[in-house]
C-alpha cells in the first residue's frame, strides 16, 4: 500500500507539543506494521523543515533531516520532485478550487502528485485532503 505523507504529519511526529503527536506516533506504528510505501514531495519537506526549525529548533530539525536521508537511502521514503508539469497541474487545481476553499499551492502540488502516482491515502491532519477526495489517515 502507498501513502503520501503531508507536512502536518511530519510535524506532529517530530514536535511532542503538537496536538496530534500521540495520534501521529500511533499511526506511525501502523504504517510500519502494514508496510506502507511512503511518498512525500520536496515542497512538503521544505514546509516541514521550516516549521520544525521555528517550533523545535535547529538541532532537532537537523536530526529530522538526517532521518529523512536515511529513509530515502533505504528506499523506505520516496521524495517526488515537483517539476514544471506538476506545478502547471497544481496551478490549474489552485485556480479551479480556491474560489470557495483555501488550499495552499503546496497542497495542490500534493494533489497533483498523488493522482500522478496513484495514491489515494494521505497521512495528514489537514482536512483539505478529504475535500480533495483523498482518504485522510489516521
Regions found by a protein language model. Give the residues of each.
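Short, well-structured N-terminal submotif of metal-dependent ribonuclease cores
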Residues: 1-40, 53-66
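Active-site neighborhoods of divalent-metal-dependent phosphate/nucleic-acid chemistry enzymes
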Residues: 77-120
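Acidic, PIN/NYN-like endoribonuclease modules and their adjacent C-terminal/linker elements
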Residues: 111-138
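Short acidic, glycine/proline-enriched helix-loop-strand junctions
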Residues: 67-83, 87, 98-100, 129-138
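Short beta-strand scaffold positions
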Residues: 5, 39-40, 81, 105, ...
